[in-house]
Curated annotation (Swiss-Prot):
InterPro entries: D12N6_MeTrfase_N, DNA_Adenine_Mtase, DNA_methylase_A-5, DNA_methylase_N6_adenine_CS, Restrct_endonuc_T1M, SAM-dependent_MTases_sf, T1MK-like_N_sf. Its EC number is 2.1.1.72. The lineage of its organism: Bacteria, Pseudomonadati, Pseudomonadota, Gammaproteobacteria, Enterobacterales. One of its GO terms (molecular function) is DNA binding. Keywords: DNA-binding, Methyltransferase, Plasmid, Restriction system, S-adenosyl-L-methionine, Transferase. This is Type I restriction enzyme EcoR124I/EcoR124II methylase subunit. SUPFAM superfamilies: S-adenosyl-L-methionine-dependent methyltransferases. S-adenosyl-L-methionine binds at residues 198-203, 230-232, 254. The C-terminus is required for assembly of the restriction enzyme complex. The individual domains assume different positions in the enzyme, allowing the holoenzyme to regulate the methylase, endonuclease and translocation states. It holds the Pfam family N6_Mtase. Residues 198-473 are annotated as: Catalytic domain.
Amino acid sequence: MKMTSIQQRAELHRQIWQIANDVRGSVDGWDFKQYVLGALFYRFISENFSSYIEAGDDSICYAKLDDSVITDDIKDDAIKTKGYFIYPSQLFCNVAAKANTNDRLNADLNSIFVAIESSAYGYPSEADIKGLFADFDTTSNRLGNTVKDKNARLAAVLKGVEGLKLGDFNEHQIDLFGDAYEFLISNYAANAGKSGGEFFTPQHVSKLIAQLAMHGQTHVNKIYDPAAGSGSLLLQAKKQFDNHIIEEGFFGQEINHTTYNLARMNMFLHNINYDKFDIKLGNTLTEPHFRDEKPFDAIVSNPPYSVKWIGSDDPTLINDERFAPAGVLAPKSKADFAFVLHALNYLSAKGRAAIVCFPGIFYRGGAEQKIRQYLVDNNYVETVISLAPNLFFGTTIAVNILVLSKHKTDTNVQFIDASELFKKETNNNILTDAHIEQIMQVFASKEDVAHLAKSVAFETVVANDYNLSVSSYVEAKDNREIIDIAELNAELKTTVSKIDQLRKDIDAIVAEIEGCEVQK
């Protein structure tokens, strides 16, 4: 019996995680992740490149060709199209085939990765390819203390990834690579606790955020994430909508070097060509990229919660075009609103931004209240959604989603209380498709629904000191049992009379027993 795609996927996931655990030995999974993820990426680009060269011609097997038959023209054309070049001898399948007997495996892998990256030098793809394998350190002691140990561990990784049933490239199973990669990242994040949440947004939450940002748009120029992590949020937009809807591609910035490389690999693994994505490394708040590429029609983000930033210690920031309109900077101890104002500045007139936020920023005073006033007075706040707790890796906090828009048709602010919409699954809660659909329905209609959603007039928000806390406007359902006092008194009366009767019965029995004893 043929397995269904769901069964195939479940089996693949089981196999991947088993391999990931088998090959790491005593090394912590979190520290070893770049080797498994890197090997998966290496296999992907090798098969992707071979498929491009063969172009559907069954008479050609690129992996069996000799490197010497490759002309400069073939190489030049390939790099212009794919962004990189891999010689037949450098392909994953050829390296993996000899891995167990290659006593120079770690050196050979390093040379191959350097060659792949350097093949893009001087081409438009150079920045997208450069440093992709930087975290795949073939000399690291995490692999073992001796060269022999290192090679054995590397061979185990390659052989493990080689054995994954990821389908033929020509069988439209390309998404299996991306799916396998996302599954691995998700599992590493779940097992890493707090640090895992910093680079991966769970797919169910990503789905909601992508739908909020893209709602009602038949096409967007490009989509942007100012705190991109591993790219999972950006890619969710690709999964939710046809490719042609996002015309110019995917843009993001990430501060952590390892995570930045994961994000770029993730783009390739989801078959996004180098000219359709641009992920930059750096601090979004103090060294923002893409000033020339803005505005963006869709912005999605799950920035770090309440991190410290330089804020008022940098006198130039209050005059920065992103922060100046609000007249105040986000507190140095809580950068949340700095990310919000950055996103707003990068948003187009027809666009939407959906940003995951720490709930405190919606009710605290001081600078944060002034920023809320700026956002509300200028009618940028479309919706605030409170989510259930424990939806994210590394935190049990019940976070909010802030939806910003520059094309609202009224001055109301919508509040949605989705804190009861969740399903318990292992250690975390999840949003089901039905939950997401329910949230999107009320978001789209803007109708008031008891205990779920309320559209609040601008004047009411102002009168409430610009408090944007969902609980201030959506009345929570009272789950306490309603007690009927009259009914309770009647039951009490009946119970008391029963007790009185029982006492009389007991007294009679006692008297009878005592009478019998006297007669004796």
